[in-house]
Amino acid sequence: MKGVILAGGASCGTLLRPLGIRLPLTAGKGYSFLRRLRTLPRRPIHLGDIKVAVTPFARGLRVAGTMELSGNNETLRRSRAQAIARGAAQYFDGWDELEPGSNCREPEELWVGRRPLTPDGLPILDRVHPFENLFIATGHSMLGVTLAPATGKALAGYALSGQRPELLEPFRLRRFASTS
């Protein structure tokens, strides 16, 4: 057996709606921006008390955090990024100094990512009935990139063999009775 695996994150609900499939999915928005600093840390750091991750890049420090529950959209609230910046500032010398060539103390390259969330916090990893060859992988929340290899391996095996691995049992779509 062969199939298609839909791994569209927070957009899976929108993508499946024309097929008559409703998913209990919403988005938790995470904010990310670039901050230019004179001195960067040598490796990524998780600032656990403020729930912010920072990653050094050649162009500056990538700062990411928060979980905003405001719907499945890409509306960006600058005040959220500014709050993250205020929290992270206490950890870095020179946060408020301007990097040469920069004319801005505001967050640069600000964007929002939509993390797919299910009501019970578990992802949906299942065949999409009534379609024999359509499978879904979504709802990983903040762990999508982390869990992608294991999810891909498990669902690819399912799609190729047609046999649901016992490992995937807790992640069935039908656990949300009114949606499947």
Please give the residue ranges for each predicted region:
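Active-site substrate-recognition segment that forms the wall
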Residues: 1-132
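C-terminal lid/capping helical subdomain adjacent to the catalytic/cofactor pocket in oxidative enzymes
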Residues: 122-180
